[in-house]
């Protein structure tokens, strides 16, 4: 590990407020670009100026679907695919991202990406048609055990925040969406000042910025202010939730909330501390996981990590387990031991070096690089700053974070059990 940034990212902010980051990779054939808005499923109440606007659940995701429709009747997805690109998009609790990868015609595909995201076109007929498509997607998700176990964990952890609800919304909430709803949210959140453009490519960074400057609105618009309601308590709204679905083995997620640091260097340090703590305590190389794996209580689907959801951050672990309560008991025991004794220094250093190596190898995963750059900018920091910062984080710092976060009263458990099994369902998915 070194305290240096392994690669240089070109950075600029355009007069319209768009932040551009480009990592040049001249020896790679494939290029990647992401245009992202700081707007996600949890951002349902906002203002630009003095007037507050309330929107139903699911608007950000709905908008992501509809922006591919162009005013001339064409479809941006088809246009990008026809030009050799592989495009897609996603909406999370606090971000919407549109992206493509390609080996040729990068500039042409970048033109298409910038044009369709900045050119909204909605009609009553097209919005009504999309309601049926998304409603079907929502109903299919209701029977998806992976979505159900996550959704119910959010219901347990969150009392009020919009992250409690599915990003796609509900069949009832999306029925309230109109063309005017979509136009209002696009005007507010898709201003260049609330967006970032991140690319890994062979094209000169100045050229990438110039194309964005030509195609996006030139005005420097105000950034919307969002309201997520009263701050969440760090204790969960509900301690556990169990449902029955068509699964072959029970699935579980155990989680806890923690309060995000202010945007900037403190946010990045907290993110790295949380991720490093989770891997050192509960990761696949830890005694916790290996003991439970040998005992048949956890399987290969297991994972653990931390993530930020607007004004709330989460630490989560889980996977398939035939005895979720036994896993939870071991989590509490592990957290208590680390609170008492701290981390083993040698084991902690091995995990830190492995995490550094994973970050380094990740620089060749272009999609991850672009998404990480975008998330960093929305969090007030530069992705590459993780490299000099990670060696500074101490085992004592991580033990303190884990001790504060993984107290018994802050944990919530979501379980999906097979239909007809012994587990009683506490709620509907």
Model-flagged regions — what are they?
Residues 253-260, 279-321:
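A structural supersecondary motif
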Residues 1-75, 183-291, 410-429:
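His/Glu-rich zincin catalytic helix
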Residues 89-92, 164-166, 187-193, 248, ...:
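Short, flexible turn/loop "capping" segments at secondary-structure junctions
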Residues 223-228, 291, 303-305, 341-351:
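Flexible, glycine/charged-enriched surface loops at secondary-structure junctions
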Residues 102-107, 201-206, 320-325:
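Helix N-cap motif at beta-to-alpha junctions
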Residues 71-185, 299, 329-336, 343-376, ...:
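Acidic/histidine-enriched segments that form metal/cofactor-coordinating
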Residues 196-201, 349-429:
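C-terminal regions of mature proteins
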Residues 49, 66, 97-101, 121, ...:
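Second-shell loop/turn segments in exported
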